[in-house]
Regions:
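Gly/Pro/Ser/Thr-rich low-complexity, intrinsically disordered segments predominantly at protein N-termini
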Residues: 1-209
Length: 209
């Protein structure tokens, strides 16, 4: 099957057929990596489907940028144990049947351990933290399908969901090999800790609410 003629490659091609919603289409693992190399948009691989993310609106993009900045205050470049990544770095989850997700952002344990599909095409396998910014088009997918797979990553300690429509941050923190604690914070005065560092909702939602 030819990636160039079968699957949308540009943002305009995707927008023309997706209507701003998630677009799913059957794809093989090999075809996924071919498409990932060419596509102008974020794309996941889940249950033998490509799941394409439509163009990010400004509010979503700003939230991802600002929260990544806050994470870099906790995990600076001088910290050789961790590295903050944006959505350009996919995460391979072997424990969930060869799933590949591109979270809005992640913190990856260093030195990195890569899944290498072929030279130059790699995915992270050792995330310490992942976060997703929830929107109308991705909420069901992020919480219903991605979350159970994220929980299967052995070294993952934190999963964060940041709501764009209202002040709400849900923090999943690993308690044991197969147990998680989740707490939702909805007050702008609320705060929570990541690695002993305090994050406040009023900083996360600065100039938003």
């Amino acid at each position: 099957m030819s990636t160039a003629t079968t699957f949308p490659v540009t943002q305009l091609e995707l927008a023309a057929i997706s209507g701003g919603e998630l677009l799913r289409f059957p794809i093989s693992f090999a075809e996924y990596w071919d498409l990932l190399e060419k596509a102008e948009y974020r794309i996941d691989y889940y249950e033998h489907e490509a799941i394409a993310m439509s163009y990010e609106n400004e509010a979503h993009s700003e939230m991802v940028t600002e929260f990544s900045h806050l994470l870099k205050g906790i995990f600076p470049r001088t910290d050789l144990q961790y590295k903050v990544h944006n959505s350009n770095r996919p995460i391979y989850i072997q424990e969930c049947d060869q799933v590949v997700f591109s979270p809005d952002g992640s913190v990856v344990t260093q030195p990195p351990v890569y899944f290498e599909y072929r030279p130059g095409m790699t995915a992270e396998t050792t995330p310490f933290l992942v976060f997703e910014v929830l929107s109308k088009s991705t909420r069901k997918y992020d919480l219903g399908e991605k979350l159970p797979c994220y929980k299967k990553i052995p070294g993952l300690q934190y999963i964060l969901y940041i709501d764009l429509e209202r002040p709400s941050v849900t923090v999943y923190e690993r308690q044991g090999a197969h147990s998680w604690m989740d707490v939702e914070y909805t007050n702008l005065e609320a705060a929570f800790d990541i690695q002993g560092h305090t994050l406040r909702l009023q900083d996360i939602y600065l100039n938003v609410f």
